[in-house]
Amino acid sequence: MQDAFLTERSLRYDIKGRKYIDTPSKYYFEDLGLRNARLNFRQSEKTHLMENLIYNELRLRGFAVDVGQVTINTKNADGKSERKHLDVDFVCNKGYERIYIQSAFALLTEEKQEQEFNSLRRIKDNKQKIVIMGGLQPTYKNNDGI
């Protein structure tokens, strides 16, 4: 489907390690109507549609778009050290410009807010970090500059 320009592949990028990861890529439909038809109009999750729409808009604006991953070290309930992988929905590059974007249809709970913002907080550079939410929301910056 990629050869027919129906889907586009987005590679996984290790943000801290600054390299591409050899894990499964993510695919986005170039036409959401064809996506829905392919799925027989059964899966209309607004979160997936919104993420696909954002990807298409970023590509239209000339960005190279990857899926980001941030690896962190944490302690589990037993106090043992473990590695966790946090996802960043989009790592967007155009020339020297880089933007990190999280897509969240709704941030109704504290847990969901923490999940969406945590990966962006762990990126220690001065590039722009954005969380795009569904619906009509006022634009604002939090204390972390996100």
Locate the predicted segments by residue.
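A cross-kingdom feature that marks ATP-driven nucleic-acid transaction machinery
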Residues: F5-L6, S10-I146
